[in-house]
Regions:
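SDR active-site strand-loop-helix element
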Residues: 13-17, 57-63, 69, 114-116
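Mid/C-terminal beta-alpha module of Rossmann-like enzyme folds, strongest
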Residues: 155-158, 162-209, 215, 246-251
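Residue-level signal for the nucleotide or nucleotide-sugar donor/cofactor binding architecture
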Residues: 38, 144-147, 177, 219, ...
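NAD(P)H-binding glycine-rich loop region in Rossmannoid oxidoreductase-like domains
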Residues: 1-40
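Amphipathic terminal alpha-helices
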Residues: 232-251
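Catalytic helix-loop patch of NAD(P)-dependent Rossmann-fold dehydrogenases
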Residues: 30-37, 41-42, 64-114, 121
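NAD(P)-dependent short-chain dehydrogenase/reductase
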Residues: 103-153, 158
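A short helix->loop->beta-strand "cap" motif at the edges of active sites that frequently abuts
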Residues: 52-55
Length: 251
């Protein structure tokens, strides 16, 4: 990395590397070494190299280090302490390593930490949350903050271009949405012709479909908005993705 930076001499570096597991975070439970290396150790190495050069940079983190809502029932803000981590002993291995990655970057100089949450967009892809909802036999109907992928990328780049203060930012589309609401939008836009089935509760989901706990949380993106970077309200963003879906019919 030092050699590349010396050769290319960039103005800004983005760390989009990480380990998420395929097809989902359950896979991280069986490859813990690489998960730890990619999500917790690598960010620390990049920090050291960037600070040695005085280089500004951004790290793509995750909102999956939180679960539920804040103590007062409101969405989590950047100053809240993550509650879905190894320290709280209730998380997936993936979430635990992403939380460690943020701990490694505590006090980092000239650094943005961007929290992504359940990425989606209008392109059919196995990593797209909308595609996953279409493919699963049964869904868990919970409320979440999510991020339109292209808007997320634009927001990250705007952080550097607009020279907003360094620090941590929740980069999610304002508001929250449930899986059931998303499937209803899909039907309204004529992109799906199936009847969706839902688990009765999280207990049934964990018993029948998951190997490790999932993060479901509401996050505030007000700090980002106050810095002058706007994203569409989440229902509007999902509607846009469904309206502009690139595959005529998936199901």
């Amino acid at each position: 990395l030092k050699e590349v930076l010396r050769s290319e001499n960039p103005d800004f570096l983005i760390n989009a590397a990480g380990y998420t597991g395929k097809p989902n975070v359950d896979a991280c439970e069986y490859d813990k070494t690489n998960c730890l290396l990619g999500n917790a150790i690598l960010p620390g190495i990049i920090r050291e190299v960037c600070e040695d050069r005085g280089l500004s940079w951004g790290h793509i983190s995750s909102g999956c280090i939180f679960t539920s809502k804040g103590t007062d029932g409101t969405p989590f803000v950047e100053e809240d302490i993550p509650n879905f981590t190894f320290r709280t002993n209730n998380c997936s291995f993936y979430s635990g390593t992403k939380a460690l990655g943020e701990e490694v970057l505590e006090g980092a100089e000239k650094c943005f930490i961007w929290r992504l949450r359940i990425p989606f967009d209008e392109r059919n892809n196995p990593r797209n949350y909308l595609t996953k909802l279409l493919m699963y036999d049964k869904l868990l109907d919970v409320e979440n903050s999510i991020s339109h992928r292209f808007e997320f990328v634009d927001a990250c780049l705007d952080c550097f271009a607009k020279e907003i203060p360094f620090g941590t930012y929740n980069i999610t589309n304002p508001g929250s949405i449930t899986a059931r609401e998303i499937t209803q939008i899909m039907k309204i836009r004529g992109k799906v012709h199936k009847e969706f089935k839902f688990f009765e509760n999280e207990e049934e989901f964990m018993e029948k479909a998951a190997k490790t706990p999932r993060s479901n949380c509401n996050m505030s993106s007000e700090k980002l908005s106050n810095a002058g970077i706007q994203m569409r309200e989440v229902h509007e963003a999902v509607d846009f993705a469904c309206t502009n879906w690139v595959v005529e019919e998936l199901v």
